[in-house]
Amino acid sequence: MSNIPSDLRYATTHEWVRPEGDGTFTVGISEHAQELLGDMVFVELPDVGATVSAGDDIAVAESVKAASDVYAPIGGEIVGVNEDLEDSPELVNSDPYGDGWLFRIKADDADEVEGLLDAEGYENSIEEE
């Protein structure tokens, strides 16, 4: 079973969201998602300053197996991206909840995060796949 930290919220599309306490949220893909994709070879990140809506496909994770869209789990403005992934996309595999984060978003409505799954709900959604 994949590692599913209880302090994060999750989208059914396998993105995780971590509040940073200043109205911004860090987003990445779950350990389960990176296990399905395999070894990352490239990550296409959104543009800083872009305004996105929940459910928009805004990034691409490319692995040796496949390319997979990454969706915005909440709406808002992209305020930062993980530039380390440009040279080291494998961070998504080795540390999906830490150094392998993808982007930061300033939420239009922070309450939108409450509509995402908690760890138990996400684990149940994986088991139903």
From Swiss-Prot:
Signal sequence bounds: none
Role noted for this protein: The glycine cleavage system catalyzes the degradation of glycine. The H protein shuttles the methylamine group of glycine from the P protein to the T protein.
Quaternary structure annotation from Swiss-Prot or TrEMBL: The glycine cleavage system is composed of four proteins: P, T, L and H.
Cofactor: (R)-lipoate
Modified residues (N6-lipoyllysine): 65
GO cellular component: cytosol; glycine cleavage complex
Domain Lipoyl-binding: 24-106
Keyword Hydrolase in annotation: no
Cofactor binding description: Binds 1 lipoyl cofactor covalently.
Protein name (record): Glycine cleavage system H protein
Similarity comment: Belongs to the GcvH family.
Origin organism lineage: Bacteria, Pseudomonadati, Pseudomonadota, Gammaproteobacteria, Alteromonadales
Gene name of this polypeptide: gcvH
Keyword terms, alphabetized: Lipoyl
InterPro entries, A to Z: 2-oxoA_DH_lipoyl-BS, Biotin_lipoyl, GCV_H, GCV_H/Fam206, GCV_H_sub, Single_hybrid_motif
A Gene Ontology BP annotation from the UniProt entry: glycine decarboxylation via glycine cleavage system
Any single Pfam family the record assigns to this protein: GCV_H
